[in-house]
Amino acid sequence: MTERVVLAYSGGLDTSVAIGWIGAETGAEVVALAVDVGQGGEDLEAIRQRALTCGAVESIVVDARTEFAESFVAPAIRSNALYMDRYPLISSLSRPIIVKHLVEAAREHGADAIAHGCTGKGNDQVRFEVGVSALAPGLKVLAPVRDSGMTRDKAIAFAEERGLPIDVSKRSPYSIDQNLWGRTAECGILEDPWAQPPEDVFVYSADPTVARTPDEVTISFTDGVPTGLDGRSLSLAELVAELNTRAGAHGVGRIDMIEDRLVGIKSREIYECPAAITLLTAHRDLEDLTLERDVARFKRGVDQRWGEIVYDGLWYSPLKAALDAFVDAASAGVDGDVRLRLAGGVAQVVGRRSPGSLYDHALATYDAGDQFDQGDARGFIELWGLPTKVWAAREQRLNP
């Protein structure tokens, strides 16, 4: 029986060429799988047909936008996920859902291997292969671009030789990856960390320096997950899409950073994530209102580690499962509304409210009606500072 390989297919040059390369090098049949995570661009039916024309025995398109939002983006929001305190894990979140569908397709079609089009310098090769190892340890993984030394020129020559329906006449100066949660750009002039990004690199966001009439949005949350916008109940996928448009119109979510890649090198990355930055800003603010102080402090460390392990390709790991359990418990009761002003590249919180608010006006106010007994402060300070006071007395005794 002829072996089968399920290929993570994007419709671009590298993965289109990979179909023929896998057949030529291994003799295996290729099942192409394209997963829609809200990346937009070319029609997915056209991509499906291209895979068949390039030699795939079967070509599958999976609409995973809702699943991506509810099962991958929502946990990231609840975990305030920002790698290096800045990057909202745009690509990192989409890889594990693609891996999930690759493994499911491999089982359904009797494949004993999966393949991806990643290079050997990026993080995605790790995310794909470690994810497959976690979900299906017996599956082999092929990486044609990395393992065959397939340069762009070689790929073009391969495509032309076989008459593959790939337009290679137009080449973006940037390497782009995008999905519902945002857009990433690298390569070209962006590889110079001193060079200012040209405006043509930005698609999801308008120039934040151009004055516009500010917009105001109110985001509703239930147990830490966004559920409504301006009083309208929306699915998370719908809500993210609308915020990408509205916040993006004010230049919100542009990030220019030097990033520590998992493989050990630093890279310059340009991100556009209007909805992500708006939602993460709102969620963190609502947590400040609703979480008990020690839970909030501890959760900041959990959030940071959660972002790191997801960036590092460990979505399907026991540590992430354990952290998820804590985040689930901490998020219960993170309900309410956050109002934000969108202007000049910033999503600024201007109001928040919650039925579970821990803000007590009678304790916080300095005006009439203050119920805070300031006389209690003296005893509290004495006990709080007692260890320091005892230590200082010892130091003075030993070191007069």
Swiss-Prot record:
The keyword Ligase applies. The keyword Isomerase does not apply. The gene is argG. Gene3D superfamilies: Argininosuccinate synthetase, chain A, domain 2, HUPs, Single helix bin. Its EC number is 6.3.4.5. ATP binds at A8, Y9, S10, G11, G12, L13, D14, T15, S16, G117. Homotetramer. One of its GO terms (cellular component) is cytoplasm. Pfam families: Arginosuc_syn_C, Arginosuc_synth. This is Argininosuccinate synthase. It catalyses: L-citrulline + L-aspartate + ATP = 2-(N(omega)-L-arginino)succinate + AMP + diphosphate + H(+). NCBIfam families: argG, PRK00509.1. InterPro entries: Arginosuc_syn_C (IPR048268), Arginosuc_syn_N (IPR048267), Arginosuc_synth (IPR001518), Arginosuc_synth_CS (IPR018223), Arginosuc_synth_type_1_subfam (IPR023434), AS_cat/multimer_dom_body (IPR024074), Rossmann-like_a/b/a_fold (IPR014729). It is found in: Cytoplasm. Keywords: Amino-acid biosynthesis, Arginine biosynthesis, ATP-binding, Cytoplasm, Ligase, Nucleotide-binding. Pathway: Amino-acid biosynthesis; L-arginine biosynthesis; L-arginine from L-ornithine and carbamoyl phosphate: step 2/3. GO terms for biological process: argininosuccinate metabolic process; L-arginine biosynthetic process; urea cycle. GO terms for molecular function: argininosuccinate synthase activity; ATP binding. L-aspartate binds at T119, N123, D124. PANTHER family: ARGININOSUCCINATE SYNTHASE. It is an enzyme of class 6 (ligase). L-citrulline binds at Y87, S92, N123, R127, S175, E259, Y271.
